[in-house]
Every structure is written in C-alpha cells, then in structure tokens.
Curated annotation (Swiss-Prot):
GO cellular component: cytosol; riboflavin synthase complex
Gene3D superfamilies, per database record: Lumazine/riboflavin synthase
Binding site for 5-amino-6-(D-ribitylamino)uracil: 22, 57-59, 81-83, 114
Annotated Pfam families: DMRL_synthase
Organism: Vibrio campbellii (strain ATCC BAA-1116)
Oligomer and partners: Forms an icosahedral capsid composed of 60 subunits, arranged as a dodecamer of pentamers.
Species lineage: Bacteria, Pseudomonadati, Pseudomonadota, Gammaproteobacteria, Vibrionales
CDD domains named in the record: Lumazine_synthase-I
Group of enzyme by EC: transferase
Known function: Catalyzes the formation of 6,7-dimethyl-8-ribityllumazine by condensation of 5-amino-6-(D-ribitylamino)uracil with 3,4-dihydroxy-2-butanone 4-phosphate. This is the penultimate step in the biosynthesis of riboflavin.
Record protein name field: 6,7-dimethyl-8-ribityllumazine synthase
Amino acid sequence: MKVIEGGFPAPNAKIAIVISRFNSFINESLLSGAIDTLKRHGQVSEDNITVVRCPGAVELPLVAQRVAKTGKYDAIVSLGTVIRGGTPHFDYVCSECNKGLAQVSLEYSLPVAFGVLTVDTIDQAIERAGTKAGNKGAEAALSALEMINVLSEIDS
C-alpha cells in the first residue's frame, strides 16, 4: 500500500500571501506567523515570498484569483480577520470569502490555504493570532507547504 503524505520543506516554492487590511492590528500578527513559518519550516527564501494587500476579506478571492492566474506561484496563503457584529453582514462576508477562495483553489489546481479568522470577539481573534490558541497564519502557511508537497507526490 502506498501512502502519500507531504512534509513541510519546500525551499524552491514561490508563495503568495494575500492579506486584508481591515482589522490589520490582528492580521499583521497572522502575517508575521506565516512568514516565519515559511522561512523556518518550509526553508522558503524571502525572495520567493510575495505579500499582496487588499481592503478586506471580501476582496481576498479576487486577489487570490489574479495571483493564481499569473502561474508564478506554488501556493497562496490567505489571511484576514472577520469579527461578528450586530448584523448578518458577518455571515455573508465569511461565506463568500470561504467559497471564493475554495473556488480559486479548484479552478487553478493550486493550494489556497485559509488563514482567515472568523470570530465572535476581538479577544478570540487575539488568541488565534499568536497567543493562547496559536497563530492561525502560521498554521495556514504549514498547510500550504504540506499541500505543495502532497500534490507534487501525486503528480510524480
């Protein structure tokens, strides 16, 4: 029986990080975690990491699609934070962001790691951006690295 499982090192990988500016006080911690993980665990050089900023989570899928369309990248890490408010807006933003990023991944057969926090409170966001609950940006970067290697193994 053959088992395909990807590791984390991907020293030649080219990674795009698409990140929303809205809630940047959280997102910058996610970005730091993602970059640190790509460099330490993935052995990815800083020259092979591109950061693309956009206004908010709703814009992430379009930016990810344009990045994927270039064919220059082996994976995309998406980062952002959506915090529930008093209206249904939260549900729409989270749903469309998630669906759009998944669509880009399937359309371009490219790993698009989901590092978008969808939380009820600012405290929950802070916990997931490098304190009690780890750093979800780092986790998304690990997912992207692993998927690069899994897909490479499948194709070989």
